Amino acid sequence: MRKPIIAGNWKMNKVSKEALDLVNQIKDEVHKTEVEVVVCCPFTVLSQVQKALVGTNLKLGAQNMHWEEDGAYTGEISANMLKDIGVEYVILGHSERRQYFNETDETVNKKVKKAIKENLKPIVCIGESLEEREANQTFDVIKKQLLGAFEGVPAEAMDNVVLAYEPIWAIGTGKTASSEEAQTVIAYIRSLIEEKYGVDISEEVRIQYGGSVKASNATEIMNETDIDGALVGGASLKAEEFLGIINF
């Protein structure tokens, strides 16, 4: 039985006071121990949020990291830096990173390997654009991204990996893949994992859906067989809405 995982991706939002206000509104309301809940904050508030999460059911996540240990990489953050302040999860390969910061399957692969090596749990994002979907290329794109991200990653490393299917056309647009559409693609992702790593691992790896998830559609999405959670964007910035998703 795969434990559902709901991760809130705050993106570039919330200064210190706002971050703590939001965490304080939700931390005592997360009682469902059968659901794992992660808040993925901007780097600037991670340390403060970590302190606020002590003794709660919430886990701490970051939104990105570099694949090198340290060095002359101005503006970057390493896995060790994240571990040092208590980060457990890290989002890698988000479509906005690919779109605006030229991330590729190759750089995502380097980050995945480094995260695993440093015992961080990567939430690895894959998904197609509207143009690719309309050209019936969804499965081709998904396969390329998934195999690229996990090139050279051994089977035993998959225990702590989470995948997130985030169709780019549904991110921040208000459009949402129907639960059936999401299930179809996520079932395909699971079949790719089975091909690469075998049936046991494919049945254990958790796969989230991300793309305009909100309280009103969370239950329908989460009821699908292969969907094990949600990577939540805008709705995670509002306590009531995020709690509505967590308590689907």
Swiss-Prot record:
Substrate binds at residues 9-11, 172, 212, 233-234. Transmembrane segments: none annotated. Keywords: Cytoplasm, Gluconeogenesis, Glycolysis, Isomerase. InterPro entries: Aldolase_TIM, TIM_sf, TrioseP_Isoase_bac/euk, Triosephosphate_isomerase, Triosephosphate_isomerase_AS. GO terms for biological process: gluconeogenesis; glyceraldehyde-3-phosphate biosynthetic process; glycerol catabolic process; glycolytic process. Belongs to the triosephosphate isomerase family. HAMAP family: TIM_B. It is found in: Cytoplasm. It comes from Alkaliphilus oremlandii (strain OhILAs). Pathway: Carbohydrate biosynthesis; gluconeogenesis; Carbohydrate degradation; glycolysis; D-glyceraldehyde 3-phosphate from glycerone phosphate: step 1/1. It catalyses: D-glyceraldehyde 3-phosphate = dihydroxyacetone phosphate. GO terms for cellular component: cytosol. Its EC number is 5.3.1.1. Homodimer. PROSITE patterns: TIM_1, TIM_2. One of its GO terms (molecular function) is triose-phosphate isomerase activity. This is Triosephosphate isomerase. It is an enzyme of class 5 (isomerase). The active site is at residues 94, 166. Involved in the gluconeogenesis. Catalyzes stereospecifically the conversion of dihydroxyacetone phosphate (DHAP) to D-glyceraldehyde-3-phosphate (G3P).
